[in-house]
Regions:
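Asp-based, Mg2+/Mn2+-dependent phosphohydrolase catalytic module
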Residues: 20-34, 43, 99, 103-120, ...
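Active-site loop/turn elements of alpha/beta-hydrolase fold enzymes
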Residues: 52, 87-88, 182
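Active-site neighborhood of HAD-like aspartate-dependent phosphohydrolases
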Residues: 24-83
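Extreme N-terminal basic, low-complexity initiation segments
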Residues: 1-11
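Intrinsically disordered, low-complexity segments enriched in serine/threonine/proline/glycine
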Residues: 10-11, 15, 165
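Substrate-recognition element of Asp-dependent hydrolases with the DxDx(T/V) motif
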Residues: 68, 72-108, 118-131, 169
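N-terminal polybasic/positive-inside topogenic patches
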Residues: 7, 17-21
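Conserved protein kinase catalytic core
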Residues: 48-50, 93, 167, 202
Length: 212
């Protein structure tokens, strides 16, 4: 586990050169006393502008999507935890280091914090396909966040741009989803579908009850 801007970030233990073997996406043995709903956000194509078929390998290539800061701030102001759940296979492929990924997230968090829109938890699967238990559409990252933050999944939402994001929510028992349309042809139904992240704030105000 690493700390980025005061936020615990889950990552592959082997890449941190720690001796004891653990299952990726480590679980805590305790839960906070209160239960709070969350908004789970995919990263590329939702929080930041999509890199297309490639990867965001450097912090200077990471650009927040128009409208996303306002949407994230609204979620926090209305009583939701903010959790980032992202697949970053570029680390597993050796295209970037874990340190580079951490730097991207640290800079992202610093920018978001200036607007009261920072994430409460960041969960990144950096493994190659077929080599772990946390790669989407597995619900593992959501379950880890639930245990770490005491989340009420039955009152939570997920925002993503790919079928694997929506299916991840279904597999975790997160009942409400918002799809951001992309070049991926949708095959899994979402609760709401938007053309871009710029429409997200309006959708939240019209459809999402305050959690306080």
């Amino acid at each position: 586990m690493a700390m980025i801007g005061g936020i615990e970030v889950r990552m592959r233990r082997e890449e941190m050169s720690l001796p004891e073997p653990v299952v990726c996406c480590h679980h805590r043995n305790h839960m906070p006393a209160t239960s709070q709903p969350a908004f789970f956000f995919d990263r590329d194509g939702v929080v930041n502008v999509s890199p297309g078929e490639g990867y965001v390998l450097h912090a200077e290539d990471f650009h927040l999507s128009p409208g996303i800061v306002e949407a994230l701030a609204w979620c926090r102001e209305n009583g939701y935890k903010l959790i980032l759940v992202t697949s970053q296979q570029g680390v597993g492929k050796g295209l970037m280091t874990q340190a580079a990924l951490d730097d991207i997230h640290a800079r992202m968090q610093a920018t978001l914090a200036q607007n009261g829109a920072q994430f409460d938890g960041i969960y990144a699967c950096t493994h190659l396909k077929g080599t772990c238990e946390c790669r989407k559409p597995s619900p593992q990252m959501i379950f880890d966040a639930q245990r770490d933050h005491g989340l009420d999944l039955a009152r939570s939402w997920l925002v993503g741009d790919h079928d694997r994001d929506i299916q991840m929510a279904v597999n975790a028992g997160v009942p409400r989803t918002i799809r951001i349309l992309s070049h991926h042809e949708p095959a899994v139904a979402a609760t709401h579908t938007l053309a871009s992240p710029a429409e997200l704030l309006r959708c939240l105000k019209e459809n999402c009850p305050a959690a306080r």
